[in-house]
Amino acid sequence: MTHELQGPEQDRAALLALIDRLAAAWSGDSPGAPCWLDPEARLDSNLHGQLGGAQDIQNALAADGRQGACTVRTSNRYAAAHGDEGVASFYAYGLLQNRSDAQQALLFGATVVLRATRTEGGWKVSHVRISSSWMRGSERLASHWLLPPSDAGWQVGDPPPVLVSELHSPWALQPIGTPPSDLFDAISELYSRYSFAIDQGDINLLIGSYTADIAGGFAPMGQYEGRHAVIGQLRSFRRHWPWMQHFADLVRVEADPDGRHANAIVGRIVPEQPMTPEGKPLYGAHYQLRARREEDGQWRFCWTDCRPGWFDTDSIPEFDIGHSTA
């Protein structure tokens, strides 16, 4: 007997499916009509500019593969609905390759936020916001982009950023709702919120991802206790890494017998090497995490530690909660 999704779970699944549709369109794998987009949808992108209309948006995304193959993968996904309005966000890492010379390649990363509306034909994306912050490789493949990202960060004369987390994040567009009932989904969404906050420098959003007694190892800075010390150090650290993007997957989670805590392992994706030769997900490091469900019903991290070392889905590390190594 299969479990049918109902209510918020059904909406969340439908919104996550829209992420897959966008990634397929960006990879050039969606040649048909852009039925996942509202006909009057809008795009704001620091790569593609401002566009209106479903077909123009799909064409602009597909054009990134005009000189060869464009492959876009996603991680750090979040989706929620409030009435007939939905929001979603995800990280995208893409690879552009030249058809005639596979050695000419460009790897890039982006943060994407979607707004969607419930229609008689299902959920449709009404707005796409794409903010790319880094790229590596042959810049010739990105000559059609308006503002190819660089590691230099903001410079005098730069246009305003496309994405301002305090205004445009899913949690700014909608109030944080009740976490999913499924523990894996709930902790996965918590990590997506945390990573969005730290990578965008949204300190208020980051504060809400930690308990007041957060502790652990924060490589390369060291071990800290308490939200004051942790947030202060992370804010200062983040200033020097404007292109930071914590691509990651939740790979293991277990509920604590007390019903209020959960242990989790999150694998850090390295976009340059996301798969094994056999096609299995590959990770370059992992986080040992402990989360607590607090009185407001929200999960927050209360302990964390970062561990270097490669592993795949057949060799996921064991739990080692409470032992800080940073």
How would you label these PLM feature ranges?
Residues 10-29, 183-199:
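Short, aromatic-enriched amphipathic alpha-helices that serve as compact interaction elements
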Residues 168, 200-201:
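Active-site-adjacent bridging/hinge elements
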